[in-house]
């Protein structure tokens, strides 16, 4: 995304390269990728919004263009970048959401495409999302596809938990998307002195932490929302409320810090932003 005021971009090519490799699609050279995005953003400069929380959303994608039937690797592809101005994700403040722990459907399994940014992952998540909405929940907390036991992602976002002062998030083992926001927040958290555990957390341990009060905060992480606080988890006949259904202090601080870097209000000591001249 980019802001008009600073004309800076937060972009990442490595994830697309890995996604393309898994799908037997050609990779886009990093220099070409970055220059293409910069050229498009420069051309669309008048469409970059300047109000707080707004941005020009940048979406690169690739699809096959070979005119043929059958299941095989295509001979030709098209690489496209589109942009759209978007309003503030939290126009009325950052409000926690109610999450359904999904124990019927699964999002991904090892050896599949769970770590890629491909349409099939989103298609397989729709049934769970519809089920959650019917139960009065906003999103789905996905469990692993083998044991149906370990938490992985929430909706289309990575998720983090603050339990007894430490941070927990699912490891990158082929079923979880290696989110750019996830990676950014891990860097920030460790710089702040937090212990970040990239490890398997069972839903039973999550619910137990909720009941005994050690589950202090929970939040999804992603490009559009940056962070999305969780106020309640519903699992089978049980439920736990997180932080009295209020956004946590750490969640708010992470949001303010990362958006501050993106908007050029805070120093970018990590080199995450790219100026567009």
Can you annotate each of these PLM segments?
Residues 29-31, 47-55, 140-143, 193-204, ...:
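Flexible, glycine/charged-enriched surface loops at secondary-structure junctions
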